[in-house]
A protein has these predicted regions:
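Glycine-rich anion-binding loop/nest that anchors nucleotide
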Residues: 269-271
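Terminal, non-catalytic domain-edge segments
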Residues: 331-357
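Active-site mouth of glycoside hydrolases
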Residues: 1-258, 262-266, 276-329, 335-336, ...
Length: 357
C-alpha cells in the first residue's frame, strides 16, 4: 500500500493482538485456553516464543545443546501453530531472547564461553543461531503436515526479543547483525514477514531520556530501514524505563508511527504494560490504544494474555501484567480490536492470499 501498511487481498490490515510466552512448552489445554480467549476477544495476532535453549522447562527443550534439536520438544509448538490456524489467528514467532528466560543469548554465551554481545559478532555463535533458525523455519509440523515456512498461520519471524548490544552505542554492531539475519530469514521464508523484535530505542547520543538514548546500542530508525525488515517493532514500559508518567507513552507511540511512515513501513507496538489496579490500568491502556488508532498505527500486542491451567484455575500473575478473559481489561481491548480491524474475517490453513504484505 502507498503508506507502507499491511494488506491482505489488496485491503489494509490493522490488528490488535497479544503476547504469550508459554505456548511452546505448556500442555494443549493451557495453549488452547489462551488461543481461544484471544479469538473471543477479537484479537488477530499472537506473539509467542519459538525457542527453548539449554535447560528444559516442564520437561520440554527445543535446543538442548548447540546444533542439537529435540524433535519431541517441538510437539507443543506444533500444536500451537495448528490450533492458531484453526482459530484464524496469526502468530509472530520469536527466534531467541536477549534475556536468560528459556535460554536465549545468555545460553549461547555460556555454550561458547563468550560475553553477551559476542552473540552479535562471533561467527561461530552466528552459525549456531543460523542453524537453529534454519531448523525451525524449515521443519514440518506434525499436525498440519506443512513446513513452518509455508504455513499461513505464521505471519512473522522475529530475530530476537528485545536485542541489545550496549558495548557498541553507535548501533553499528546490532544493525549489521540484524541486516545479515533478516536477509537470511527472508531467504528461508520469503512469503512470511520479518521483524527485529527490538524495543524501539532511538540511539541518540547525549539524550537524557533513556529510551531515546544510545545506552543499549539500538538505533531504531536504522533497523527499520534495513531492506529485509518488513516492519518496525517497539515496546512501551514507562515504569521500568525511568518511572515516567503514562502520558509519556503517547509521545512514544506517535514518534514511532511517524518515523515508520517516513520509510513507508508499518509500525507495531508489540509489547506494552503498566502495573496498577485494574481501573487505573484500564484508563492507561485506553489512552495508549486510542493513540495507536488516532495516529493510524498498524498494530499492537499487549503484554500479556494468559489462560487457564490444566485444572481450570487461572494462570498465575507472575509479573503483575496478566490479562484474563473475561475482565474489564479484556472488554476494553476487545473494543479496540473491533475498531482496528472491523471487517477482516478468520483465515484458516491454506487461505488464498492470507500472508500480510
Amino acid at each position: 500500500m502507498s503508506r507502507g501498511g499491511f494488506a491482505i487481498g489488496g485491503r489494509r490490515f490493522r490488528f490488535a493482538g497479544t503476547n504469550n510466552y508459554y505456548l511452546h512448552y505448556k500442555n494443549h489445554h493451557m495453549a488452547d485456553s489462551v488461543l481461544t480467549d484471544a479469538s473471543l476477544i477479537g484479537l488477530r495476532v499472537v506473539r509467542c516464543w519459538g525457542f527453548l535453549d539449554g535447560a528444559p522447562a516442564d520437561g520440554t527443550v527445543l535446543q538442548p545443546a548447540p546444533f542439537s534439536y529435540d524433535e519431541d520438544g517441538f510437539e507443543p509448538l506444533d500444536h500451537a501453530v495448528f490450533r492458531a490456524g484453526q482459530l484464524g489467528l496469526r502468530l509472530v514467532i520469536v527466534l531467541t531472547n536477549n534475556w536468560p528466560d528459556f535460554g536465549g543469548i545468555p545460553q549461547y554465551a555460556t555454550w561458547f564461553s563468550a560475553e553477551h554481545d559476542d552473540f552479535f559478532r562471533r561467527r561461530d555463535i552466528k552459525n549456531c543461531y543460523r542453524s537453529w533458525v534454519r531448523h525451525v523455519i524449515g521443519r514440518r509440523n506434525r499436525y498440519t503436515g506443512m513446513r513452518y515456512c509455508s504455513d499461513p498461520a505464521i505471519m512473522t519471524w522475529e530475530l530476537a526479543n528485545e536485542p541489545r548490544c550496549p558495548s557498541d552505542t553507535s548501533g553499528d554492531t546490532l544493525v549489521a547483525w540484524a541486516d545479515e539475519m533478516s536477509r537470511y530469514v527472508k531467504e528461508l521464508a520469503p512469503r512470511q514477514l520479518v521483524a527485529v523484535g527490538d524495543e524501539g530505542f532511538y540511539g541518540r547520543a547525549h539524550e537524557p531520556c533513556y529510551p531515546y538514548s544510545d545506552h543499549d546500542g539500538v538505533v531504531w530508525q536504522r533497523l527499520i530501514a534495513l531492506p529485509a525488515v518488513d516492519y518496525g517493532t517497539f515496546h512501551l514500559y514507562p515504569q521500568q524505563w525511568g518511572d515516567m508518567l503514562p502520558e509519556w507513552g503517547i509521545r512514544w507511540i506517535h514518534d514511532h508511527i511517524r518515523d515508520a511512515r517516513a520509510v513507508r513501513k508499518p509500525a507495531v507496538l508489540e509489547e506494552f504494560g503498566w502495573r496498577a489496579d485494574e481501573a487505573t490500568r484500564d484508563a492507561i491502556y485506553r489512552a495508549w490504544t486510542d493513540a495507536v488508532e488516532r495516529f493510524d498505527g498498524d498494530g499492537d500486542h499487549f503484554w500479556l494474555l494468559t489462560g487457564r491451567n490444566a485444572d481450570d484455575t487461572q494462570y498465575s500473575d507472575y509479573d503483575g501484567l496478566r490479562v484474563i478473559y473475561p475482565s474489564t481489561t479484556a472488554t476494553l481491548l476487545a473494543g479496540h480490536a473491533g475498531r482496528m480491524c472491523p471487517s477482516v474475517g478468520h483465515f484458516g490453513h491454506g487461505s488464498a492470499g492470507s500472508h500480510p504484505r
